[in-house]
Amino acid sequence: RFTAPPRFVFERVLAFEARVAALEAGERGGYRERHVTAALERHIAETLLASLRIEPEVAPDLVTRQAGLARRRLEERVGGASELASAARAEGISERELLGLFRRQARASLYLDRMVAPMLEPSNAELSALHRSGRTPFSGAPFESVQPGLKRWFVATRLAEALQSYYQNARSRLDIVILSLPTQGE
């Protein structure tokens, strides 16, 4: 049986990721318990995937490039860079911590792309067919003008589905322990 070292998610990081989940759902008034649950599940899946070995080894500049794309995808999902910055400020998340989050997302997405199924570079034929289906936020505009945004949206959607699937498959093998600070008098 494989045992991984313990990993910790601090409350303010989880609160930030829950705010992001709420923003992704179009809810601007804070976050709810379901957002915390979704954020925790995504965080766990990304952390597990990011820690797995990728063959052949990924070049550091590719991780950096993918982290930049992860930032862009997240900004688009939450309604822009200012929304992301506001969520980070609300929970005291520094730029360095944001970079760590994007690097974790980058490594997880690279693992999924290289070791599970290609998903970071959809073909133009896939994107065109998706655009014609009318099931995207870009369906009302000409394909050529929305192709880059459609690609980012499609990749983000595929990654979210893959992360959720990975978490659901791993869930029965995980031990999640909630730690809290002792209250006064304990």
PLM features: what roles do these ranges have?
Residues A50, A85, L112-A117, R132, ...:
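Amphipathic alpha-helical segments within well-ordered protein domains
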Residues L98-L99, M115-M119, F138-A141:
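Short acidic, glycine/proline-enriched loop segments that cap or flank alpha-helices
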Residues R1-A106, E121-A129, S145, E161:
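N-terminal targeting/tethering segments
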Residues G80, R104, L112, V116-A117, ...:
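Alpha-helix capping at helix-to-loop junctions
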Residues D113-R114, P118, P122-S133, Y166:
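Non-catalytic accessory/assembly modules
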